[in-house]
C-alpha cells in the first residue's frame, strides 16, 4: 500500500479505538496522599469537604510518621484490606483518643473508597483505616442510628493503585493469635506522605 492509502485506514482505526480515560484527580481543596507499601504505592484523595474530622485525624497520624512500619493486618478478598494500627509482629501501636464517627456524611463504601476502621463501639475509630476492594454499601454504609445500622465513615478514595489493593487482598493469609485473615508474609506500610 502507498502512504496515501494507509492514511485513511489509520484515521478510521484511530476514530474507532476506545477513548483513553485520564486517571481521576482530587477535587479542589481535598488533600492527596501516597500510601507506600511493600507491594506498591496507593495514591488517595481525602474528602476534607465531607469527612473533616476523619481526614484531620488521618493527616495527624501521617504528619507524625505513625503509619511507617505498620502493616495491613486484615485482608479479605472480595471485601477490604485493613491496616495502619499494628506492627509486623501484630503489636498494636498506641493512638490518640477515638474520633467522632462521620458515617452520616452520605458517602458510600464503593470499590476503592477508604473507611475508618473501628470496633463495635460507634465512636472508636483511631488510626486504622481500610480500603474497600468491592462494593460494600449494603454492609458498611449508614442505614440508621442503631449500632448495627450506623455504619463506618468513608473519608477518601483511591486515585491510583487500586491494583495494589487487589494484590494485597489476594495474598495468602492465616489466623495469628486472635487475628483472622492476617497475611502470612507481612504487607508493610513503608510510609504515608501528603502530596503538596
Residue ranges of each PLM-predicted region?
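Cyclophilin-like peptidyl-prolyl cis-trans isomerases
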Residues: 10-196
Amino acid at each position: 500500500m502507498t502512504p496515501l492509502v494507509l492514511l485513511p485506514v489509520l484515521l478510521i482505526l484511530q476514530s474507532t479505538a476506545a477513548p483513553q480515560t485520564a486517571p481521576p484527580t482530587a477535587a479542589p481543596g481535598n488533600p492527596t496522599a501516597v500510601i507506600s507499601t511493600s507491594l506498591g504505592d496507593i495514591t488517595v484523595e481525602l474528602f476534607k469537604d465531607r469527612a473533616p474530622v476523619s481526614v484531620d485525624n488521618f493527616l495527624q497520624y501521617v504528619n507524625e510518621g505513625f503509619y511507617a512500619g505498620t502493616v495491613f493486618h486484615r485482608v479479605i478478598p472480595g471485601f477490604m484490606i485493613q491496616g495502619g494500627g499494628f506492627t509486623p509482629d501484630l503489636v498494636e501501636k498506641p493512638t490518640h483518643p477515638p474520633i467522632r464517627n462521620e458515617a452520616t456524611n452520605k458517602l458510600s463504601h464503593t470499590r476503592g473508597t477508604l473507611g475508618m476502621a473501628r470496633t463495635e463501639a460507634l465512636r472508636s475509630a483511631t488510626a486504622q483505616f481500610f480500603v474497600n476492594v468491592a462494593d460494600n454499601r449494603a454492609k458498611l454504609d449508614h442505614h440508621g442510628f442503631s449500632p448495627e445500622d450506623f455504619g463506618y465513615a468513608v473519608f477518601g478514595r483511591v486515585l491510583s493503585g487500586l491494583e495494589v489493593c487487589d494484590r494485597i487482598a489476594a495474598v495468602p493469609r492465616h489466623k495469628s493469635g486472635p487475628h483472622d485473615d492476617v497475611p502470612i508474609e507481612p504487607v508493610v506500610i513503608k510510609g504515608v506522605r501528603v502530596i503538596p
